[in-house]
Amino acid sequence: MTYNNNNNYLAPPLMTSTSTSTSTSTPTSTKTSPLNTSSSSNILKSNSRNPSPNNPTNIGNSSGGGGVSSNNSNNIVYSNSNNINTSTFHYNFNVKFNEIVNSIAVNRAGTLVCLGGKKSLQVVDLELLKSVRNIPQQSKWEVGVVDWNSQSPNLVASSSNQDTFIWDIENPKYPLLGQFSSHQRAISDLSWSLFDNNILATTSADSFVNIWDLRTPKKAVKFKSLKSHILGAIQVKWNRFNSNVLASAHESYLMIWDIRKDSQELNTAVHSAKVYGIDWSHRDEKEILTCSQDKTVKIWNYPSPKPKSTIITSNPILRAKYLPLGSGGIVTISDRGENHIRLWDSATSDYSTPVETFIGHTDNVRSFDFRVRSSQNDNDIQIVSWSKDQYLRLWKLDDHLKDLFNIEYIPFTPLNLPTTTTTTTTATTTTTNNSTSEMLNESTDNNNNTNSLNSSTLLSTPNLESSINSLNMELTIEQQQLDDSNTPKDLEYELKIIQSKVIDKYLKIEQVNLFKRTCVVICTIPNNYQPDDDNNNNNLNNLNNNNNTQDNIDNNDDNNNNELIDSTTVQIRFSFPSLYPSTYPNLEFIPHACTTPLKTNLLIKSTLNELCAFKSSQSKNCFEQCLIELVKLVKQYILDEKPKNTSINITETNNNNNNHNNSVQNNNNNNNNNNNNNNNSGGGFLKNVFSKSSKAVEVVKQPFINLRNSSGRIDISQQQQQQQQQQAATTSTSSSSSSSSNTQQQQQFLTATVSNKGGTVLSKSPTSPRMFEQYRPGKTNKTNEIIFLNNYKDSNEEQLPLSPILTNLNNNSNNNSGSGGGGSSNMNASITTSTTTNDQVSLSVHRNSYRIQENYPCPRLCGAVFGGCGKLIVFRNTIITNIPNNNKNSDNSNNNNSSSSNKNSDNSNNSNNNSNNTNSSSSSNNGGIANVGGGSSSTSSLIHHHLQHLHLNQPQLNLLSLSLSSSSSSISDTTNNTSNTTQNIQNTTKNINPPRTYKELLNILSTTNNTIKNNITGNNNINSNSNTTNNLTSPNPNRLNRLNEKQPYSSSPFNDNPLINDYKNNIFGTPSTSHSFLASPQPSSPISFMNHIDTLLDDSENNLMTMDNNNNNNIVNDEETQQLVTSSSPTFSKSSLNNINNTTNNSNNNSSNSNNNSNSNNNNNNNNNNNNVNNNNDNNNGNGKSLQKTMKIIDISTLSLLNVNLANSYILSGKPVEEICKYNSELAEKENRKDLVKLWNTLGMITDSKLYLKQLINQQQQQSHFGFSGSSGSTGMGGSSSTGIASSTGSNSIRRPTKLESSLHQSISMSNLGQIPSSASSSYSQTSPSLPYNQLYHQTTLQTPSSPSSQQQQIQFYQQQALQLQQQQQQQQQQQREIQFKQTQLIQQAQIEDNGWPNHALGRKLVKSLIDYYKKLEDVQTLATISCILILAANQLQKLKNGESITSIGSSSSSSSSSLASSPLTFSAGGGGGGSYSPMFNFSAISISAPMGIDDMVSKQKGHLYNYYGQQQHSHYHHGYQHHNIHQTYGSHPNDVITYDPNLCLLDPNNSKIYDYYRQQYSDLLYRWGLLEKRAEVLKYIQHKEVDKGINFSIECIKCNRKLNNFYCNNCKIYAVKCSICNISVRGLSSFCLYCGHGGHTNHIKGWFEKQTKCPTGCGCTCSFNLPFIQQQQYQQQLQQQQQQLQQQLQLQQTQQQQPQHYQQHRHSMSGTSHYHQQQPHTHNYQQHISSYAHTTYQPHTPRNNGQPVLPQQRRYSISTFDPQQEQDHEKFNHGGGSGGGDAIFHDILFSPNSSSSSSSYQQQTKNSHQYHHPSNPYMFSN
């Protein structure tokens, strides 16, 4: 069990009872090994401790014999050494492995132990106590010894015969690092150096001690070989303090070596027999112990030749080791004679008895090691041992032993238990060899260690079985009940014990997930269960047969119950909390697996919860008691339900028998009986009421199908097959009998079965419970059987039909067995056999079949699911039933009615109805369409009724019906007829319930609803004295045309399998007859939305279509009728359509004959009637039911706060913030979002620049310097509001200011803005300087005091006046220019306060409250736009603070781009009351540049985004945006980069990442809406961009497939790149194609592609267009040479021929940018072609490109070799004046059909393409 660094529990799954190497493997749920990740190495290494000679007690190594592991898992799940918890460290544990293990070794961290087995190495996690890694041995010899590297915790060394293996347990695929043969004889021991992880010492029977340097494991270097010259060596150990000293044991000699010398330092005989073990002291450098076959352990202090002390034992010693902690402790195991582990104290002089004996192993102990936990104040140690009894045991040291050996520790106190005093009583325990016991949890003392496991300390105890403390030496474990007084309270331990026993044969634990702490149990009990059956389970509780019993429970059931019987299943999921058993588990029923009703499940759950609560109050385990109680409750439920079912069946049978002759008149009795049974239609199941105590009843036995064991196919014996065939023959024969005989047989069978007193021996009755045989491929399913299969079929099995719920059963190919004879319609539905036909019963593609349970839920017939972008998908599956037409007698009666008069038609019609009632039992189920809700048989009305919404209970119902009879038997317009029809339908629908189970649905789909037929034919007496044409609705041509448009797939809406896909109106599925719901208005509220959905689905189905013979149009439902319940079936057959047409014609003709009483039309009526009868006969097979599938996609965007119209119209940049807020506010008002109107007005006010100004120049200074003047109505912000709010809101009307506006006005007043006094006067004339001269003349004439006498004087006077006016005009213009200049200067000198307004209560706090509000509403659209606008406002303020010039947006002529100079800032002079003022500055002209466009970003190769002031961040999203006159792309000037100061922004800088998240989510929403430009605009506001990551190319070794960082594989010692031509590894310059990955030596590849274009490997890749070969410098030299050749050719052509004058001028204009063509007649035209062609951009060629290959924009290398053949062709093409050669790479480009130029155009192209490095360059060159 493991805890991670956060103390989270990581629990393993349960292990099997016995772990074997061939069958046991770690479940897949535990394959979360850190060794499979790159961080595994860090986990391992972090657990290790650095060795130090000053701290030798931290080292614990192992030695011993070999062994084999058992687990096939390749992953390791292990714990952190720093978190060795108390789950396994403070207790004794026992783990069973059914393998032979010779040696074990514990890693330094104390978390893993390696078992050296016969064929593999097995790594066991000591916290999980299970195998987590199994490494197969690479040798035919078994593993001799293993040792764990103390420096590198991932390295393990093992020996096999003469070879040494080095393993890396972190590597899941290739764990073997190296293998080398180190000796001539078998290796007896090996030891890693404690100071250098690369040094390994091995010893062998060849008497040599070899020391290896493993820096390169495959080429291990033996740098030292020590020769003993004596017999073979047994063990070797390194000194714990000196890295140069090691000791080895040779027979009876001990040798100590110094590797710096060639000879040994000590060579002496230490024992009289063979030395088997040596170990260096952890405290003294010179101290070493030896153990021998002479039954002694000697302690030496070399170089003294005498032992320091000697321990004498009674048995030969196999191994002896010092305790890693404390002082003086020595642990020994015996070679033979005893099976105990003894602990000795070397500090005392009494060595006669050990201080502790660990008893538990039942066979010789072969190896042991220490598990150490060492810290500053808490140290602990545990002994890990392995014995021949195949048990791995963990032994803890008691506290008194720790005190004895001076081990510092913290006493362990179990939680939830009182602290007890530690005793020193020595207690030993032993266990018998129990084959069923896999892991035993033992204790060695009498204290509270055993019983202290609780929910807090042992959340992850492994799969253990407990042995109870006892002072006795013998302890047998038999069937253990979970005794709460002496059992550890651990979930895993409890589950293990429960799995090892059989609580009940009907109970099974299906799934255990200890990581999630869940357990799924299933209880399956047959319905014929008897209490006597429990006696058969008494012999199943023997622990010696646990493994076989649990696996053979189903097999026992097969032997005991060979008949296929119905059963009751309950499946529960137990979820155990972390504090279990202090808190009780959570119980959850799995609905689809439970066959019990909901009421029973709730009762079971409440009972189990009470039991769990009682146990948890006492902190006791409750799981086992819950399982026992669960089985009892299910059994009690079956026993309680059995008498109820029996009595119901008997009652139903009697009622049916009594009412057989009067079934038509007493339909209510049958309906009441149907309500008492779940199966209210034909094909119901009969409950099993067999008594096992009776031997008189013979039942045809069927093979029991194991529902849970679906791994194999169950074969049926020949005898059983014969019985099944006889059963099928009997069933088919009996089904064709009369109804009376069937009833008598049913009653007799039920009576004999239930009473069973007369000893009557009965065979299988045709109406007995249906018995299902095993499905076999290739065999046709018999009648009356519904097979449900539960496993995938084999590949060679035949294809089976679809599921019954998806199969359209309206056109059954065979008649129902109960339809003939007329009596089956009167039978009760619960005891009649199913009439499901052979062809329509579908078998799913599974293998093992089992019976459909009674309580399987019905599939969902309707529902709705939300889709993306504000869509709701609503679907409905409607069951439509074919209601039978009238038979021939009714047709004849109708014919007689047609010949009679109107007065006699009533009597005839009544008699016709009576005849229908009389012959209803013999009528066939054919003809018209109706639903399960009911319908009129006499009129064959198309009545559609949804199963789950019965809307037929209205008191008044207008029912439009279509007359299908020969008479005018349509619905009358009178209220009486309508109410009678409505009442009949209501009576019928009350007896029909929606299907609640899957079986009921199958019965509805497969059988004919005879009950509806009888009800309607017995009660509907419709008057037909009125005219038929008056009852029918007039045809609607518009509706008809629209219907035809919606069905383009067929001219007629009636198809055999119609399917409509109306993408325009989002309707899919089977077509309905009307689509009036398509144009329905969208909902505007959730309440209207619910009504809208119901209207949509009802309108799509509740429609009527009739065929008018005169107009040839479809008659649709009346527009004025709101309650219309009739509808058409989407599955008319052709015969049904003809029948409708004929009956319609017949009805019309009958109506005319009835009115006119003409005899000439009677013959036509008779002919029509005959045709009608024939059509009815042809349509005998048209009965059945079908599913009308309708799906509607509804737009519910109006219900969501996200608005696509606002998203498409919002402005987020390109204008001043005030204008943006005003514009967005108007958009929100149009969308009726009043909250957004207030929001945008508020944002416009709080982002006003005046709120940030620290102070302004007072009004007197402004007047004295600039002489401002203006009219009282002139304002700078477009309004005359005293608070300046009207300008921001864009309204000049007088209104009461809001609270926010009042607060803002107060804030502005407090910011030293002041008000303009009313005494301010104008310093210049208000006469406009732009008045024309004639206006000035007339004005001056009025100012003349008197006119002179002469005309000449008047002219001079006027001229002087005009001159004065001109001078005044010039002065005024000069003053205006000065005013504008001073205003600009004043703006630049204005000081903006950084931390003033944002920290105000109406600043960031208000913004935060707005964001929190819309965050609760989850309106990501508003959140994103708010964050964008506030950043834009901060950017504008930043420009004002920096004094930058503000430019306009868009073109200079735009109306919205007026500069600041064109909008003079003026003050209002006041006047009137109050002294109003206008804002000092007009900030409406402040604007910024729009985001960067795509073209400019490509040219600059990088774009800058909005970011904090003073920072630049490169764009990761290359999206531009252009939008009319609002937005403009970036220029190349650096000032175009938009920056802002976070101190000026109203957004909290600490939440910038959250705001980026809002923008990112909103951008994703815009992407789904298709608003890509808007998305790009929002993405530019994102501040935290992802760092651009380049393309990383990985190279894999051609031999081991490892991914390499360079071109050399250290594992294989080869170069990874292999040449595709010479097949030799490439060491130098290489070139390869990035599309196919093939390449090689550059020279080889270049030589290949001089003549070839395809890849040399034959992969088909055109590498010649993807593979560079030479450097760019060489390629540029080639281009220069070609350019010089072209210039020489042009000069030669100029001397030979004179050029036209206009050509010479054009030549000078194009010099330096283009080249001339070699062909003289086309030089001028070609030059023009070059001027346009030279700027063409080319994309790199890829193998997926089917066009001509083109040159990429960037090539690092190219080919310098030319093809001579291509060169000649090129010269011929250019008439001998070509470029002199064609590059093999560019040949197709130069001579492509779309290019008529030579390489001169190509030079210009390549010159432009090499100006920058394109990021999408797919070429790579390596050296």
Curated annotation (Swiss-Prot):
One Pfam family per UniProt: WD40
A Gene Ontology BP annotation from the UniProt entry: positive regulation of TORC1 signaling
PROSITE patterns listed in its UniProt record: WD_REPEATS_1, WD_REPEATS_2, WD_REPEATS_REGION
Disulfide bonds: none
GO CC terms in record: Seh1-associated complex; vacuolar membrane
Biased composition (Low complexity): 16-61, 419-432, 440-461, 654-680, 717-748, 885-926, 966-993, 1014-1041, 1127-1183, 1282-1293
Region called Disordered, residue ranges: 1-68, 418-461, 530-562, 649-687, 714-778, 805-840, 883-940, 966-996, 1014-1058, 1122-1186, 1264-1307, 1697-1725, 1764-1823
Source taxon at top rank: Eukaryota
Molecular-function annotations in GO: signaling adaptor activity
Renumbered ranges of WD repeats: 138-177, 182-222, 228-267, 270-310, 312-354, 360-405, 1207-1250
Biased composition (Polar residues): 749-768, 827-840, 1710-1725
Keywords, sorted A to Z: Repeat, WD repeat
Protein name: WD repeat-containing protein DDB_G0292056
